[in-house]
Regions:
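The beta1-alpha1 cofactor-binding region of Rossmann-like NAD(H)/NADP(H)-dependent oxidoreductases
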Residues: 74, 97-110, 143
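Conserved mid-core segment of classical short-chain dehydrogenase/reductases
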Residues: 108, 115, 132-147, 166, ...
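Catalytic Tyr-X3-Lys loop
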Residues: 123, 131, 139-158, 181-182, ...
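Catalytic loop of short-chain dehydrogenase/reductase
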Residues: 169-219, 231-232
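C-terminal helical subdomain
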Residues: 10-21, 226, 243-303
Length: 303
């Protein structure tokens, strides 16, 4: 294997990492009662969006909106309500919809649905929906499929922010809301390999865009940052080579439970940064001063 074929392997920030959930981030230890959350890309039971919605239900979120391009099944809605009850929480309100985040009209219509159902309040927005093109070289790629990755991952993120950021800010100001936006990026943004360039570069754009968003609207009450969900075999990875998919070590719960844990409490110093869900969160908290003083976990180019 040549150096151009080999993925760049980067050291994890924490000494300890996790492939699945662990007690420190357990949703059962969080209290999100009274909170209203929205998660995109939540239709697949083996996916990060569904795991995240389940974690919020188990953490006691009062209302959860879930959306996906393929729609949300009635079974999934029932399972979310059951997850809350099984965790000893009140049954959560669940709002679901079929939404194409790359289309403004689709997003705007669902925004009205959520606003009415949630009493014009929203505490947490998790932008998880994504598209990944089949692995191929740039010249061999289908241009429409290749560019769809950017339409969903970048344009879709812009549409969701344009629609729901005012609700996050308003809830923060009037109802002591959390005002948290978590954008799901990827460790792929930090490395390069043959194939999948559209996905990797779109997630790289998400990192910088989120940093800019937090800078522009942090003073309005927004706290925005990115997470890497981990290397998880989900429906999103179906276009990756099967030998690559079979080596992915993480479970959806490491992403879902970490995201719910991150959303349960505002930590202003995380604004604009990149957090990898498999990292040990107790260690991340213990290294806060190092991260802030060194302005770490942000994009930088050294000369």
């Amino acid at each position: 294997m040549s150096s151009t074929d080999r993925p760049v392997v980067r050291r994890d920030f924490t000494e300890k990492t996790h492939a699945t959930s662990y007690p420190f981030i357990s949703p059962l230890a969080q209290d999100l009662s009274g909170r209203r959350v929205l998660i995109t890309g939540a239709a697949w039971e083996d996916g990060v969006g569904y795991a995240t919605a389940t974690a919020f239900a188990r953490a006691g979120a009062s209302a959860i909106a879930v959306m996906d391009l393929r729609g949300i099944s009635d079974d999934l809605v029932s399972q979310l309500k059951a997850a809350a009850i099984e965790a000893g929480r009140p049954e959560c309100q669940v709002v679901s919809g079929r939404v194409d985040i790359s289309q403004w009209e689709s997003v705007a219509a669902f925004k009205e649905t959520v606003s009415e159902a949630f009493g014009h309040r929203l505490d947490v927005l998790v932008n998880n929906a994504a598209h990944q093109e089949p692995y191929s070289s740039i010249l061999d790629a289908d241009p429409d499929v290749y560019w769809k990755t950017w339409e969903v991952n970048v344009h879709g993120l812009f549409n969701m922010t344009r629609a729901f950021l005012p609700m996050l800010i308003d809830t923060r100001a009037k109802h002591d809301g959390l005002g948290i936006m978590i954008n799901v990026a990827s460790s792929g943004a930090l490395s390069v390999r043959k194939g999948g360039a559209s996905y990797r570069t779109s997630k790289l754009a998400v990192l910088r865009w989120t940093e800019a968003l937090n800078l522009e609207h942090g003073g309005d009450g927004l706290l925005a940052f990115c997470v890497n969900p981990g290397a998880i075999k989900t429906h999103l990875t179906i276009n990756e080579p099967e030998e690559v998919r079979n080596m992915l070590p993480h479970k959806p719960e490491i992403a879902g439970d970490t995201i719910a844990w991150l959303a349960a409490k505002r930590r202003e110093w995380m604004g604009g940064r990149y957090i990898s869900c498999p990292w040990d969160m107790e260690e991340v908290l213990g290294r806060k001063d190092e991260i802030v003083e060194g302005d770490k976990l942000k994009l930088n180019m050294h000369f």
